[in-house]
Amino acid sequence: MSDRFCKECNNLLYPKEDDNTLFLACKNCEHIQEAKSHRLYVKNFRPKHASIELYARDLVQDPTLPSVKINCGNCGFNKGLYFQPRGGEEDVALSIFYLCCRCYHLWT
């Protein structure tokens, strides 16, 4: 049985903190056990090439991305970001993408 379920009644265990120690507690039978890991939830963010447009506004706000003076073909603004997406496809991984800081237009 997984450590996410109560060993006594098989109900789901919920995180509970006491004295800076993480426990997993059952709300049904009050069984408590110390958590094996301090990690409660993991969210892996691995966007695909087609979804870059969905998070373009977040990319513009990222101060770690390098900026470049380049004219946008969509609105003519002269500041953009450039980055190399991490993807499984070799041809995408070798491309450099530019993103307009004003209209969020994306081009290679």
Swiss-Prot record:
Q: What Gene3D superfamilies does its record include?
A: 2.20.25.10
**Organism domain of life:** Eukaryota
Location within or outside the cell: Nucleus, Nucleolus
This chain's protein is named DNA-directed RNA polymerase II subunit RPB9
Instruction: Give the GO molecular function terms.
Output: DNA-directed RNA polymerase activity; nucleic acid binding; zinc ion binding
The record places its C4-type zinc fingers at: 6-29
Question: Can you list the GO cellular component terms from the UniProt entry?
Answer: nucleolus; RNA polymerase II, core complex
Q: SUPFAM superfamilies this protein is in?
A: Zinc beta-ribbon (SSF57783)
Q: Which UniProt keywords apply?
A: DNA-directed RNA polymerase, Metal-binding, Nucleus, Transcription, Zinc, Zinc-finger
Residues annotated to bind Zn(2+) 1: C6, C9, C26, C29
